[in-house]
Amino acid sequence: MSEQEPRNFLRRILPELKKLAKTLFPFLRTALPLFFCAHAVTTLVCAINADHLYLLAENFLQHPLLLALNVLPVLLVMLLLYYISRRMVFSIGLTAGLFAAMAIADSIKSSMRQEPLLPTDLTLAKEALAILKTFPDFTLLVGAFGIIFFLLLLILALLLAKGREFAPKARLKGIGGVLLCALLLNFCYASQPLYDSFPTIGNPNFQVNQYASRGLIYSFLHQANAMQVKKPNGYIADAFE
């Protein structure tokens, strides 16, 4: 092989590598911060509602799929908000606020009723207000100021931060891709055998233990599927009319 051949090869390949770098860099610049922030939000959720965080962390280390099933919904929500708003800080902040509120609600319900947060609880606004009235006025005041301050930060992030320029087709493809991924992943969250395959810390029939062992996010989404009413085999609606 002559010395000229490697040089010619490099001359041919370098332009292609530059094109690839130009394509990948914007994607990585967006994907990597969202990826790490999704893990950070998941860690925050686990820290808020897990009584034995080290045991949950041990489960995550032994079963990486369990960690992925808790992180992926956070990442998908961030991506969806990012493609809609075109603002990364706003998307991360709103996602963190939503999942943190979910974790706080689960922690309060678990401590007061020994039951985890269920999808049906989202419709019980009156009951939630009744529970809030049992808290001291100072706690409610601090919580209200905290929520208002957080909302102001979100509004500032939405209005002041410069949004990334997306072509309309690119935004639609991004939103469609996120929704498609969510639809496909839902088969994993609906799977009872998969849910039962992960170990439970303590009594396996106690739902609070299931949430503490598998993570709030995964367990909540599994319950959202498990609580759906299904028609029995051979059921004919006309026969009961």
Q: What residue ranges belong to the model's regions?
A:
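Extended, compositionally biased non-globular segments that define protein topology
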Residues: 2-122
